[in-house]
Amino acid sequence: GFCFGGWGVFRLGGKKVSENNDTPLVDCISTAHPSMLELSEIENVKVPVQILAPENDMMFKQDLKDTCNRVIPSLGLPYDYQFFPRVEHGFAIRGNRNDKDEMEAMVRAKSCAVYWFKHWFHSK
């Protein structure tokens, strides 16, 4: 999920198939420059998590990045945190293709997400 979708995928990553079935609703989650995340959503995630984090992000500030990097590993979940220097919130979907740093970040983010999903979907 991108931006607000980050909040959504964290919520989905904490859901069960049903009240009688503890199987997670989704296999894994990946988010780029998430927004609207709260501690409870981070603490309740139950599936492997990937975060693609830009250096400058008014929605995913450093304190929230630090919280994710502290809390998610403590849950015992597979966790992949990718840092993208010199780019801002929205880089993965609204980056400037004419800016070398932004273009490299968009390509790298796409590659990271594709690899993440292939790994977790094929390991089931």
Predicted regions and their residues:
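Conserved hydrophobic residues forming the short capping helix/wall of the S-adenosyl-L-methionine
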Residues: 68-72
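Cofactor-binding loop segments of dinucleotide-utilizing enzymes, especially the Rossmann-like FAD-
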Residues: 34, 54-56
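C-terminal catalytic histidine-bearing segment of alpha/beta-hydrolase fold enzymes
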Residues: 75-124
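A short helix->loop->beta-strand "cap" motif at the edges of active sites that frequently abuts
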Residues: 26, 47-48, 75-78
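Primarily recognizes the serine-hydrolase "nucleophile elbow" in alpha/beta-hydrolase
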Residues: 1-44
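Conserved alpha/beta-hydrolase "acid-adjacent" motif
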Residues: 58-67
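Short beta-strand/loop motif that positions the catalytic acidic residue
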Residues: 45, 50-53, 84
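A short beta-to-alpha transition loop/helix N-cap that caps and shapes the active-site region
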Residues: 36-41, 59-60, 92
